[in-house]
C-alpha cells in the first residue's frame, strides 16, 4: 500500500459546512474511491488555521490519478468549490506532503 498525505484549506466561516458535506460523502463517490484502490482515507481539520490534512492509502498511483477524471469526482469538486480554495478545473488547491516518519 502507498501512503499519501496532503494539505488543503477551508474558507473562513465554512468549516461546519465542509464537515456537513462529508457526513457522509456521496455513496457514488465512495464507490469510485474504493474501485480505484483507495483505503483508509481520512481528512482532519486544524480549526485555528483552517488547514485540512488528508491521509490516504492507495494501491496504485495511476489509479489514484484516474479518480480526477471520473464524473463523480468532478461533480464533487464543483459541489465543494464554494467552501474551499479551488483551481480553475474546480479541483481543490492542495499540496502533497513528504513523509518524514512512519512506525508500523
From Swiss-Prot:
Enzyme Commission number, as recorded: 5.1.3.32
Record GO biological process: rhamnose catabolic process
GO molecular function: L-rhamnose mutarotase activity
InterPro entries per record: Dimeric_a/b-barrel (IPR011008), L-rhamnose_mutarotase (IPR013448), Rham/fucose_mutarotase (IPR008000)
Keyword Membrane annotated: no
Localization, UniProt: Cytoplasm
Positions of the catalytic residues: 22 (proton donor)
Family assignment from sequence similarity: Belongs to the rhamnose mutarotase family.
Known function: Involved in the anomeric conversion of L-rhamnose.
Protein name: L-rhamnose mutarotase
Organism: Opitutus terrae (strain DSM 11246 / JCM 15787 / PB90-1)
